[in-house]
Every structure is written in C-alpha cells, then in structure tokens.
C-alpha cells in the first residue's frame, strides 16, 4: 500500500519550483505548511475525511462535521498556531438535502464551540 508520505513526495517538486518558494518557511508535511505572507506567518492545513476510513457512514452528519473540524484544529495546534478561519471542500454521493443541512449545522456548532 502506498503511504501518505510517498504520495506527498510526488508533489514536492511543485514547492521547490514555486516562484514564491522564499515565502514557504516550512513545506507541507503531515500537519501543515508555514507561509510568510507580508511579514505574518500563516499556517495552512488541508485535511480529507473519507467514509469507511475516518468515519462510518452510520454517523450523524453533525458528528462527522465535528470530527472533521477538530482533526484539522489538532493539526494546527500541533504547529503551535491558532485558527482564524476554515475552508471546506466536500465530495459526496449523498442525495438528501437534509444531510447537508445537518452537516452545516454541525460545522456551525463546532466553530462556535472553538470561537472561530
């Protein structure tokens, strides 16, 4: 089985050849990357959660949202940073609008809990 580290190595050349590579203080690793943006350090993290790997399909949408966000927050904490905002990417075959409404509610509740 291919490891996450092996896959990340396939993309390292993109960082190495970036026009802005001097702004990349710490390249993307398992947790996050540190980027210098006009004198401020920005820690950027992207996570993917997958049904059957990170959560079971029987979980409530609110709980999936909570788990997804708190996992990302843990990565940021591991880098010694504090969250300012989140960005969400979602792919799904679920065709019930109520599922997305509940997922959205779970996101809002989690963001409120952590004052984001």
What is each residue range found by the language model?
Residues 62, 66-116:
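A glycine-rich phosphate/pyrophosphate-binding beta-strand-loop-alpha-helix module
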Residues 1-60, 79, 88, 105-110, ...:
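Extreme N-terminal cap/leader segments of soluble proteins
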């Amino acid at each position: 089985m291919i490891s996450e580290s092996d896959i990340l190595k396939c993309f390292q050349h993109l960082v190495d050849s970036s026009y802005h590579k001097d702004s990349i203080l710490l390249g993307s690793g398992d947790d996050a990357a540190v980027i210098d943006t006009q004198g401020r350090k920005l820690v950027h993290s992207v996570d993917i959660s997958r049904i059957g790997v990170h959560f079971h399909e029987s979980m409530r949408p609110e709980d999936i949202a909570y788990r997804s966000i708190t996992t990302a927050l843990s990565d940021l904490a591991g880098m010694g940073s504090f969250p300012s905002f989140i960005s969400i990417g979602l792919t799904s075959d679920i065709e019930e609008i109520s599922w997305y409404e509940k997922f959205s509610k779970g996101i809002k509740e989690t963001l409120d809990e952590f004052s984001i």
